A protein has these predicted regions:
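N-terminal glycine-/serine-/threonine-rich beta1-alpha1-beta2 phosphate-ribose binding loop
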Residues: 1-57, 62, 66-81
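Short, solvent-exposed loop/turn elements at domain surfaces
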Residues: 2-4, 121-123, 151-153
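Residues embedded in well-ordered beta-strands within globular domains across many folds
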Residues: 13, 33, 110-113, 144, ...
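A structural signal for well-ordered alpha-helical segments within the folded catalytic domains
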Residues: 42, 46, 69, 91-95, ...
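A contiguous active-site-proximal alpha/beta segment in oxidoreductase catalytic domains
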Residues: 54-56, 61-142
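Rossmann-like dinucleotide-binding domain that binds NAD(P)(H)
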Residues: 141-228
Length: 232
């Protein structure tokens, strides 16, 4: 996956371990871009922020609510510039949705439905019972990072780690930040007051094949041209 970048920037230093990069280049870099697996986002981001480096971290920002709260506190205490890689937030479509709603062009919004075709990787699986040979191109210990060190299995790589709770956040964690961003921003939603969830068979190691989540958000302060009532 990195070959195109390596070919374009042949003189750039390359590292397997982000910690070694921080040790060797910490004094010569201003910021970092983090696009590793979900379960390593928080620890790499936290180390960078503690060093005073600005951070652009791919979505989902973290692997858990605790990690998100930790990074929020670090951002406030360090004062570094941070951004999450939610590319749709920078597009014209998001701005147009906000403009339409804030101008009252579609009236009060009381219900929003969002859907995705994800997962496009396997989910709803039991944990593998056997170990496979680790590919020569993969440092399994480094990939595992802060997660539990499971025996390597081909079900995890490439790409499919997204459906396994030790490494990924399932379809909801992978896509909700994209498809829910517009209503969150346009309707000025905060924290929900009620959350209900249902899914196909729940397993301890892997995300379900399908799920439905319902959230209720309280009314917000009205805007000049539109009211912001409770939203489902």
């Amino acid at each position: 996956y990195a070959k195109g970048v390596f070919d374009e920037f042949p003189n750039a230093k390359k590292y397997w371990d982000y910690r070694k990069m921080y040790d060797e280049m910490g004094k010569s870099i201003d910021g970092v871009i983090i696009a590793t697996a979900d379960h390593t986002h928080a620890i790499i981001t936290a180390d960078a922020m503690t060093m005073g480096k600005h951070v652009y971290c791919q979505k989902p920002l973290t692997h858990s609510v605790y990690e998100s709260r930790l990074l929020t506190k670090l951002a406030a205490s360090t004062g570094v510039v941070t951004q999450m890689g939610n590319q749709g937030a920078s597009g014209e479509g998001t701005d147009l949705v906000c403009e339409w709603i804030w101008n009252g062009e579609i009236g009060e919004v009381t219900k929003v439905e969002c859907a995705t075709d994800r997962p496009i990787w396997p989910q709803g699986l039991n944990a593998p019972e056997k170990a496979d040979r680790i590919p020569n191109t993969l440092n399994w210990d480094l990939f595992t990072g802060p997660a539990k060190l499971n025996p390597y299995n081909n079900v995890y790589h490439p790409w499919n780690w997204r459906g396994w709770w030790d490494y990924g956040t399932g379809a909801l964690g992978d896509m909700a930040c994209h498809i829910l961003h517009q209503p969150f921003r346009a309707l000025k939603l905060g924290y929900p007051t009620k959350v209900e969830g249902s899914s196909t068979l729940l397993l301890s190691a892997c995300a379900p094949q399908a799920q439905h989540v319902k959230m209720i958000f309280p009314a917000r302060d009205n805007m000049p041209k539109v009211a912001l009532p409770e939203v489902e």
